[in-house]
Every structure is written in C-alpha cells, then in structure tokens.
Amino acid sequence: MSTGATSGVLVAVCTTHGVRDDGGRAGRTGIDKRPRTGPVAIADDVLDGDLVGDELRHGGRDQALYAHARDEARRWAIELGREVPPGWFGESLAVDGLAVTDAVIGQRWRIGGDRLGAAVLEVTLPRTPCTTFSRWVEEPHWVTRFTERADVGAYLRVVQPGTVKAGDVVEVVSTPEHGVTVRQLFTRTDPAARSRPGPGPQGRGRGRAGPRPGRARNARRHRPGETSTIPLPDRHPTDRMTS
C-alpha cells in the first residue's frame, strides 16, 4: 500500500459463492465470496451476483461494496501461516497498490477503462469485525486481533453505476480536505472523532480509542435504502474532482 498513491489495480471482483448457515441472529451469511471472471455490473446498491445474508447489519446504500487491500491480506497470510485468497475477508473488491484502510472518508474512486461505463465509488465507513467473521475465519480471538491490527478495509457507496473487472485501474478522482481516514474513524484517533460522542447511542467513551459507533446505531445505518447518518465533514468538495 502507498498512502500517497493515486491509482491501484483491481485484483479481483468477488461475489457470494453461496449463502451459508451461520450461528448468528440472521442464521445465514453471504461472507463466502469468490473471484468472478469477466465484467461484473455494479448497480445503485449492489454488485451483480452478490448476496447479503444479514440485511439488517449489512448492505444498503453506504455499504454497497466492501474493499480490502491485498497488501493487508499478505500481512495476515504471513501471520496466520495460511493462504488468504481474494474474497477471504468477505470483500467485494480486492485492491492492490492503493490505500484502502488509510483512504480518506468521502474519497472517490473510478474503476474501469471506459469512462462512460466506469463505476464511481465513494469511501464511506470502516468494517467492524463481527462474530460471523470470526466463525468464518476460525482463528482464535479473531475479532480482537483484527480490531487491534485495524487494517479493516472500507465500505463503499455507488456514485455512478458501471461495469468492472479484474485488472481494471482503480483511480482516485477526488479526496475531501477534512483528511479523516477510514482507520482514524475506526480507531477514533482523529481530532473530529475525539470531539464527538463515543460508541453507543448514549455517547459512551467520549474521546476514547475504539471501534466505531455501537450496535444500535449500526443497525439503523445498515438498513437498505436509508441514507447515511455519518457525522462527518463534507465528503466530496467538487473543486477537488479531476477529469
């Protein structure tokens, strides 16, 4: 990863291989994702062929896609002593050569060679590891380890639907000036986060490092069709857009 890079490569586009039974509240999960061959369409809130097992906590406008960086996956592969192929983290987009967890909230990416058919995506939220993720990975203390590493990847919303495929260039086309990154929002280490109430609907943990807002607010945020309630600076100043 290079935090100053303005482009990277889409290594794989991954969709649900099959909905699996899960011990969580939803009883099923679409976390098992595998790379697709050929072009894949991105619509307003979904990647073609992808499925969401728990629609209360996943999917929707601000979590239409999930991106994870291959350099972060390679670090986990070394630490875990196992292969970590694209899709293993449940990601829709496996990206190389571009900051994902260290992307600025509201940053926009254009993916695809044909600009008329390219997709434009906007970085929205960090991924919060859950028990479904832990059951899928089958590594001890996984939620704690993943949280402490904080290489969590980024959720994306669809600004412009399009078609993408493995090998496409991922180009940064705009970056908001507030500078708050996905990692900072997740760990609550940015100055703006310190001035806001901490996790949970009652504002527990003001100014304290830790994951992003608690389950009750997460559940509301994840419902399909709802608009974002993220308390952040302006995400997308148009004067930073490149052609």
Predicted regions and their residues:
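Electropositive, beta-rich accessory/interaction domains or terminal extensions
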Residues: 1-135, 141, 174-243
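A short, contiguous structural element within a folded domain that forms the immediate neighborhood
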Residues: 144-145
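Short amphipathic alpha-helical interaction segments
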Residues: 159-162, 177
